[in-house]
Amino acid sequence: MNISKVRIATLSIGLAVGSMALQSCDSLTKTQKGAGIGAAAGGVVGALIGKKAGNTAVGALIGGAIGGTAGAFIGRRMDRQAAEIQKAIPNAEVIREGEGIIVKFDSGILFDFDKTALKDAAKTNVQSLAASLNQYPDTDIKVIGHTDSRGTEVYNQGLSERRAAAVKAYAVSQGVPSSRLVTIGKGFAEPIADNETDAGRAANRRVEIVIVANDALKSTAQKQG
């Protein structure tokens, strides 16, 4: 599976009239898009990426962006890391936009149905991801668990939390500092597909790992300009 390419709209400022209009920027690199993302454009980015990931993941991606030259510096690092993750874990979906990365696993890749223990094959995937996180230590990570809508809200909330915790625990066992990882369970609150179909429910059962620059990397990036 290739790195997901999400079309982004960015801000174009008309200096003569002081007005702003949205335009497509497919010709820009991911890094250039990261440099141009501001508050208004971020909302458009969120709407587009949100078709592939939940609101919590998208919010973390946009909320961590600083834009400008510093954002471009961070974007170049994220370009490299995203490509390496996709090569190492071809069955994951890697969404690379702006100044961050979302790595998405269908829950069937990681867990048996209704279970929270990682499959043996899944441990290899998380081990590969942990190796990348250790290679790029100046990032913060959110691990977000999601379920489909079958079952009660309370049960699914707990299931999503336990699955996120299982991914974190294995990453920590592979040397990733626990302090870098935050787990979040969203139950069935953030579907990305129709829960009325088997395919939709399968898409909604997922774990999203969001990778963004930490404060140290942002500080380094801001000094580059």
Model region roles, listed by residue range:
Residues 1-12:
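Bacterial N-terminal signal peptides that target proteins for export
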Residues 20-24:
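C-terminal motif of bacterial Sec signal peptides marking the signal peptidase cleavage site
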Residues 26-84:
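Short, low-complexity, glycine-enriched hydrophobic/amphipathic alpha-helices that associate
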Residues 146-220:
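Periplasmic OmpA-like peptidoglycan-binding domain that tethers envelope proteins to the cell wall
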